[in-house]
UniProtKB/Swiss-Prot annotation:
Residues 1-26 form the signal peptide. Disulfide bonds join C116-C168, C123-C130. Belongs to the pancreatic ribonuclease family. The lineage of its organism: Eukaryota, Metazoa, Chordata, Craniata, Vertebrata. GO terms for biological process: defense response to Gram-positive bacterium. Does not exhibit any ribonuclease activity. The keyword Metal-binding does not apply. The gene is RNASE9. At the mRNA level, widely expressed. At protein level, restricted to epididymis. Expressed in spermatozoa (sperm head and neck), with higher levels on ejaculated and epididymal sperm than on testicular sperm (at protein level). Expressed in the epithelial cells of the epididymal tubule (at protein level). Not detected in muscle. GO terms for cellular component: extracellular region. It is found in: Secreted. One of its GO terms (molecular function) is nucleic acid binding. Pfam families: RnaseA. This is Inactive ribonuclease-like protein 9.
Length: 205
């Protein structure tokens, strides 16, 4: 069996120990969060899948969204090191690279899932359709400022309170629409404004 693997995938197997070491380094990061064993197993399997996979990434699961996006009260959301702490603590990366930006939301999963059934509005990039929350949500926007070899990175942390824009996908097993990605966390203008029929903020004169 091993001979077959080495013949079929010689280079990935040579690099695999380094990837496994990275995964171990992730788990050694000092964090206040204690992930269940099943979450750790899922992360390990996800790491292997990302390494060997040549196709598109599989849609995020409910548990992955809860683990990597949703947060609970703890560290102040306006803390300057919030993103550095949470990004590394929650192992937020894509194909062995740190993500350029990320959002953490202070809300429950059921509340986030309900947004999938709200009206469509333009996304931040103006291309895809997003669903927008009806109320304001607190969260943190993380912007990558310096990227080094995993697990080293630096993020700028920006507290926001605004309307969440998300994309959703259909989950066959659950027969429901579930959150896929967080597109933006739009802060309402400081002065008076209203939402047009397209869901776009219009500033009154």
């Amino acid at each position: 069996m091993m001979r077959t693997l080495i013949t079929t995938h010689p280079l990935p197997l040579l690099l695999l120990p380094q990837q496994l070491l990275q995964l171990v380094q992730f788990q050694e990061v000092d964090t206040d969060f204690d992930f269940p064993e099943e979450d750790k197993k899922e992360e390990f399997e996800e790491c292997l899948e990302k390494f060997f996979s040549t196709g598109p990434a599989r849609p995020p699961t409910k548990e992955k969204v809860k683990r990597r996006v949703l947060i609970e009260p703890g560290m102040p959301l306006n803390h300057i090191e919030y993103c550095n702490h949470e990004i590394m603590g929650k192992n937020v990366y894509y194909k062995h690279r740190w993500v350029a930006e990320h959002y953490f939301l202070l809300m429950q999963y059921d509340e986030l899932q309900k947004i999938c059934y709200n009206r469509f509005v333009p996304c931040k990039n103006g291309i895809r359709k997003c669903n927008r929350s009806k109320g304001l949500v607190e969260g943190v926007y993380c912007n990558l400022t310096e990227a080094f070899e995993i697990p080293a990175c630096k993020y700028e942390s920006l507290y926001r309170k605004g309307y969440v824009l998300i994309t959703c996908s259909w989950q066959n097993e659950m027969q429901k629409r579930i959150p896929h990605t967080i597109n933006d966390l739009v802060e309402p203008p400081e002065h008076r404004s209203f939402l047009s029929e397209d869901g776009v903020f219009v500033i009154s004169p």
